[in-house]
Amino acid sequence: MWIPIIIPFGLRGKSKLIDNKKRICVNCKNSGVQLVKNDEWFHLFFIPFFKVKNGNMFLHCPSCGATIPYYEKETMPTFNNPDDVKFEAENNEKNHKKGKYDAPMAQVPPEYLQRQDQYPNQYQQQPQQQQPGYMDYNYNQPPVQLNKQAYDNYQQNDYKSNNQPNLAKENNISNENEELGDNKKEKKEKKHSFFSKLHKKEKNEIKE
């Protein structure tokens, strides 16, 4: 009797953390990006026995799951030969040339420069003149000393002009009081003359 035996084996990738340097993720701006290397191993019964293939290093962000390829600084091209450096400089000059739509720089004719020397700008030589109706406020000037007598006269005139309505009201009230007093005096005099006449009549009647 044959009994089938299943032996699990195969190739499987295994990730390895290279370092824990501080790197910032381009996607989520997180500072916990890890440098990881994913190698391929031979597994037997889910146990890694030997490495079959070296994998590439990449940057992995554990927060958002983004993977970015990583390039070592040593793999960057270095120009030790001066001819290579010259070739690189020529390529940069070709790339930075002006396009066909860029207008050329305007060249000033020599005749215009001669005329400009003969007739300089007159506005720069003329001094600035003060316009009429505007005061020149110079804060460095000394303070103006006021005349005390003129200031006192100004205050008196201002006080009189402000108190003219009150004075007019007072004059009107005094005139009204004088008129009332004159009327009362006239009434008293009339009463006195009336009673004096009655008294004279009574005396005359008694004598008779």
UniProtKB/Swiss-Prot annotation:
Residues 138-175 have a biased composition (Polar residues). Signal peptide: none annotated. Residues 187-201 have a biased composition (Basic residues). Residues 118-208 are annotated as: Disordered. Residues 118-134 have a biased composition (Low complexity). This is Putative uncharacterized protein DDB_G0288303. It comes from Dictyostelium discoideum (Social amoeba).
